[in-house]
Design a protein with these regions (language model features):
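Short acidic/polar active-site loop segments enriched in Thr and Asp
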Residues: 4-5
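Metal- or metallocofactor-binding catalytic centers and their adjacent structured scaffolds
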Residues: 1
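Metal-coordinating catalytic core of metallo-dependent amide/deamination hydrolases
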Residues: 12-123, 127, 159-166, 171-172, ...
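His/Asp/Glu-enriched, well-ordered alpha-helical/loop segment
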Residues: 103-112, 120-144, 148-149, 154-162, ...
């Protein structure tokens, strides 16, 4: 049957309205799950609770945030500098901003997806999510997801298990940008991109994805 579900990973007002229209007109041929831009469009998720379940192949799945950029563009936030550089990439948000965004998602009982490529971004997400869970005594984390998780360290993977965080790996990345990763990160770090075996050893639930339209959706290049 091929690909039967797709995800829109950053819904805005205009995109939400478009997908709703497609659903109402019964134009969607496969299931579409939308994750709302939490920072700017929280109202979409809060005001449309009826869309939490499928209606003509469309539903809302939760929220999405971005914590850094990409390793090939040297904007992924790293703990150590890129090769032959003093630059480490940069964070999108401060720790306190991330703490507040996570708190908002859990307050709305919503799953939160966070774009994290660099090890510093992964550390920030895990640390702040754990802090929110502890400070507010939340019982359910609603299965938060670390999207890409390309350079997440084993230390963070271990800390993800108690909060039921799921790494979703972009494993096809090395096929397309492996030479750039070697140049930007060096052999030691580049060889650890998408540490699926570490996730398995840690006992984590994990998934694979492709970042269409960054890549054409060809699942065989992922598995």
């Amino acid at each position: 049957y091929g690909i039967t579900t797709i995800q829109d990973g950053f819904l805005t007002d205009s995109l939400y309205s478009l997908l709703k229209l497609f659903a109402e007109e019964k134009l969607l041929k496969i299931d579409v799950v939308g994750y709302v831009d939490l920072e700017n469009y929280r109202n979409i998720y809060q005001n449309h609770s009826k869309d939490y379940v499928y209606n003509n192949h469309f539903r809302l799945g939760g929220y999405k945030i971005f914590l850094d950029g990409s390793p090939q563009g040297k904007t992924a936030w790293m703990k150590e500098p890129y090769e032959h550089s003093k630059e480490k990439g940069y964070p999108v948000h401060s720790d306190e901003d991330i703490y507040e965004l996570i708190s908002n998602a859990l307050e709305d009982h919503a799953q939160l997806l966070a774009h994290c490529n660099g090890d510093a971004a992964a550390e920030q997400y895990v640390k702040q999510f754990t802090r929110v869970m502890e400070n507010h005594s939340y019982i359910d984390s609603y299965r938060p997801v670390m999207i890409h998780a390309q350079l997440v360290r084993e230390e963070e993977l271990t800390k993800m298990k108690p909060i039921s965080m799921i790494p979703s790996f972009f494993v096809a990345h090395t096929y397309y940008w492996g030479d750039i990763h070697l140049a930007n990160l060096g052999e030691e770090r580049a060889s650890r991109i998408s540490p699926v075996k570490d996730a398995i050893r840690t006992g984590l639930t994990y998934t694979f994805h492709q970042d269409t339209p960054v890549l054409f959706p060809d699942v065989m290049k992922t598995i």
